[in-house]
A protein has these predicted regions:
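Generic N-terminal amphipathic, Lys/Arg-enriched alpha-helix
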Residues: 1-10
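Walker B catalytic acidic pair
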Residues: 219-220
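Conserved glycine-rich beta-strand-loop-beta hairpin in the small C-terminal domain of fold type I
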Residues: 41, 305, 319-337, 342-356, ...
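N-terminal small-domain helix-loop-helix segment of the aminotransferase-like
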Residues: 10-107, 410
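Conserved core segment of the aminotransferase class I/II
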Residues: 85, 104, 241-323
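Well-ordered, non-membrane alpha-helical segments in soluble/globular domains
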Residues: 13-23, 54-57, 163-165, 195-204, ...
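Conserved core of the PLP fold type I
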Residues: 68-212, 223-242, 394
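PLP-dependent enzyme catalytic core of the Aspartate aminotransferase-like
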Residues: 88, 92, 96, 168, ...
Length: 411
């Protein structure tokens, strides 16, 4: 006898990231933090190996009236000023001319999961990269949605050919397409598409839309740590070229932008050529929000609005220090990796660098050997994720060489 619904996946969840983080923590306690390289943590850490909580974010949050913190949001779709601020923040200087709306969500995870449930039925197929944040597949699975994966890379660039082949395969079995592009600052490789790659992608989606409706979910969780921050939104201008039968939902997260991982604040920005198309998606998302989380934290929304308006300049200045720090860390690691011949996927910017693995059997052996040497990383599909977002500079130096030595010992 069972009590859960018949369609439920009863396989216990295994979160590989948290289990490895726990092993690294235990090793530090036993052998001393100075003897352990912990490149697992996917949050921004300072050189003191402590979580960064931006002063310009939390000093104002602490000053918010307790009643504001205690109160419900004014709407389950989000406070009006917050929804407006999210749209303006997401697009910034990009000249986006599409009809739009914003639904407030508990973080970027809430935005992505709500979008998947909005556009796909049980038995449908979601298209995602073969190297990706593991939660995409889990979000699909809990809704009995299948997953088809495109190959992320062809040599050192985005594999548009694989995207096309994967979409064409899915087109044979359903009359609508829903796919995820995590860009810029892809998790876990640090790749960012060029504007030309975006143009080619949009052009192809327009071709697909002649026979199938298309929804593109653009997960921008890490965009506010782009190394080219002033031009990080330029690619969004390619969205203006979408056909009437294409919709884009930009999935925004305050977790990284405001170092507010636990406040659960984000939004789904719906974009389409026609207002009625946006409204149709908005109606379902409003109901989904009301039925699932009711509303998101009122004070988190209030804080975001203040930061991106009155508090913007000092916030941007403080955050830039950590962007520069992460850039320094990644440059050191990549330079040394290239010197010793440690293969990695094409990295441009972001929280993570991912080493190339020929297959997952070899990856697992390498991952185990790294841990035996007190080096903790996260195994991803055909890769080993190195979190430069949390690794202090002193521990970045020499890491690539240590990894290469371990690789040689396996070969």
């Amino acid at each position: 006898m069972t009590f859960v619904k018949k369609s439920a996946d009863k396989t216990p969840i295994v979160d590989n990231v948290f289990s490895i983080v726990s092993k690294a923590k235990q090793d530090k306690q036993q052998n001393g933090s100075e003897n352990v390289i912990d490149a697992t943590i996917g949050s921004l850490y300072g050189e003191d190996e402590q979580l960064v909580a931006l002063d310009e974010v939390f000093n104002h949050y602490d000053a918010i009236d307790h009643r504001t913190k205690a109160a419900y949001a004014s709407s389950f779709s989000g406070n009006p000023d917050y929804r407006k601020a999210v749209y303006e923040w997401v697009k910034q200087d990009a000249d986006v001319k599409l009809a739009h709306s914003v639904i407030a969500t508990p973080g970027g995870s809430g935005a992505v999961s709500m979008s998947i449930e909005t556009f796909l039925d049980a038995g449908d197929t979601l298209i995602i990269p073969d190297i990706a944040w593991g939660n995409y597949a889990l979000m699909a699975s809990v809704n009995n949605i299948d997953v088809e994966r495109y190959h992320m890379f062809e040599e050192d660039h985005f594999n548009l050919c694989s995207v096309k082949e994967t979409i064409q395969k899915v087109m044979l079995k359903q009359d609508h397409i829903c796919m995820i592009i995590n860009d810029p600052c892809h998790n876990p490789t640090g790749y960012s598409l060029t504007k030309e790659e975006w143009k080619e992608l949009i052009a192809f989606l327009n071709e697909v839309s002649k026979t199938h409706s298309v929804v593109l979910l653009n997960d921008i969780a890490y965009i506010d740590y782009s190394y080219q921050l002033s031009t990080s939104r330029d690619y969004m201008e390619t969205f203006n070229d979408i056909s009437d039968n294409v919709m884009i939902v930009v999935e925004f997260s305050c977790s990284k932008a405001l170092t507010s991982y636990g406040l659960r604040c984000g939004g789904a920005v719906i974009l389409a050529q026609k207002e009625e198309a946006v409204r149709e998606a908005e109606i379902f998302m409003e109901k989904k929000a009301r039925a699932t989380w009711s509303n998101i934290p009122n004070a988190a929304m209030s804080n975001f609005v203040w930061i991106v308006t009155e508090g913007k300049d000092p916030y941007m200045k403080e955050k830039q220090k950590y962007i520069d720090l992460m850039k320094k860390r990644s440059e050191i690691f990549l330079e040394e990796a290239d010197q010793v011949g440690l293969a990695h996927y094409p990295y441009k910017e972001g929280f993570f660098v991912t080493l190339k693995m020929k297959d997952n059997v070899y990856r697992d052996a390498f991952h185990k050997a790294l841990m035996a040497a007190h080096i903790y990383t996260v195994a991803v599909n055909k890769g080993i994720r190195v979190a430069v977002c949390s690794l202090p500079v002193a521990k970045v130096y020499g890491l690539a060489e240590k990894m290469k030595e371990i690789e040689r010992s396996l070969n």
